């Protein structure tokens, strides 16, 4: 596994409740990226299924919110993500449009942080790339953290869904 800027390992305390959430597929929120990917030759599914804070979250979700609040993050939001087999999210930078509007962070985007908690051990075909560094072989609880503009990509060419928890906050 590559050496990343900032990684924490969260001791697993969660059960499989995340498997049964009301996941919904939503269009990728940056049509310019989607257009660029199509021009590059990508012809795959660019979205996974999300269950964000507008929907019922697992009973233990508050523990993640508290953990990141204790790290100094403000306005912590969570979104569970199920990436099905064949889903590819090519290299992109998150734009946080709704988050910036909701918490009045226009001009302060540099304070936004993102963490991805891997809810299960790595499976063959599951992939993350962060700032050009490939990441595989993770254990449940592995949590890379990055600044708002870090380029990253994800894919699932494996046989099982890839489950993660996306955490957003600002410092």
Where are these regions (language model features)?
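Short, conserved beta-strand element in jelly-roll/cupin
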Residues: 82-84, 102-124
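Structured loops at beta-to-helix junctions and adjacent beta-edge loops in soluble globular domains
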Residues: 42-43, 49, 83, 120, ...
């Amino acid at each position: 596994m590559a050496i990343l800027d900032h990684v924490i390992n969260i001791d697993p305390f969660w059960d499989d409740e995340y498997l049964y959430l009301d996941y919904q597929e939503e269009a990728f929120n940056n049509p310019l990226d989607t257009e660029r990917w199509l021009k590059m030759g990508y012809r795959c599914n660019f979205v996974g299924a999300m269950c964000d804070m507008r929907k019922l979250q697992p009973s233990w979700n508050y523990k993640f919110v508290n953990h990141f609040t204790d790290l100094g993050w403000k306005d912590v939001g969570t979104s569970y993500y199920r990436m099905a087999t064949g889903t590819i999210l090519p290299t992109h930078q998150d734009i946080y449009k709704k988050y910036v509007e909701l918490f009045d962070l226009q001009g302060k985007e540099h304070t936004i942080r993102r963490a991805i908690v891997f809810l299960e051990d790595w499976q063959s075909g599951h992939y993350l790339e962060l700032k050009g560094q490939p990441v595989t072989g993770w254990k449940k609880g592995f949590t890379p953290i990055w600044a708002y503009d870090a380029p990253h990509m994800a894919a699932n060419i494996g046989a099982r869904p890839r489950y993660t928890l996306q955490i957003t906050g600002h410092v």
